[in-house]
Amino acid sequence: MSWGLQILPCLSLILLLWNQVPGLEGQEFRSGSCQVTGVVLPELWEAFWTVKNTVQTQDDITSIRLLKPQVLRNVSGAESCYLAHSLLKFYLNTVFKNYHSKIAKFKVLRSFSTLANNFIVIMSQLQPSKDNSMLPISESAHQRFLLFRRAFKQLDTEVALVKAFGEVDILLTWMQKFYHL
């Protein structure tokens, strides 16, 4: 097991305990049956900007966007739960997992861990419905996610990782507006 995967459970525990301290509770957002608590949005943004300001200089392709407007525009409340869950899972399993070694070199591991841990908290709380009546909604969200993933896979892996990480602000802004944070 790699060092990065060994540290994630410890960091998750720290985040969980930290969120239990009075006065440090995170914000709550909900949409339909989706609800997330324990997210400290200002700290999430601060962590993102710390990492982005370090790695964004590597993004040489400014004409390509992975989180295109058609991925995030006109998303229904029910659909948002599925889409946010899929995007966060992709970021954790693909982008953050493969970006960890670069982050260690830049010495912004603490901010990176804050960002990853908050994504874990949000994703673990988003529980899209498995009800068959929701199938058309989940399929629509899946199609939106596939647009994002296809754009990611069309790029060289390293370029795609930098690009995806640089677009975390687009994802956070969408979630913030969508859930009225």
UniProtKB/Swiss-Prot annotation:
Residues in the signal sequence: 1-26
Pfam family, one: IL10
Disruption phenotype: IL24-deficient mice are more sensitive to CCL4-induced liver injury than WT counterparts.
Expressing tissues: Selectively expressed by Th2 cells. Expressed in the liver.
UniProt-recorded Gene Ontology molecular function terms: cytokine activity
Gene Ontology cellular-component annotations: extracellular region; extracellular space
GO biological process: apoptotic process; negative regulation of cell population proliferation; positive regulation of apoptotic process
Compartment annotation: Secreted
Keyword Oxidoreductase: no
Domain of life assignment: Eukaryota
The keyword Flavoprotein belongs to this UniProt entry's keyword annotation: no
Similarity section: Belongs to the IL-10 family.
Protein name: Interleukin-24
Organism: Mus musculus
Gene: Il24
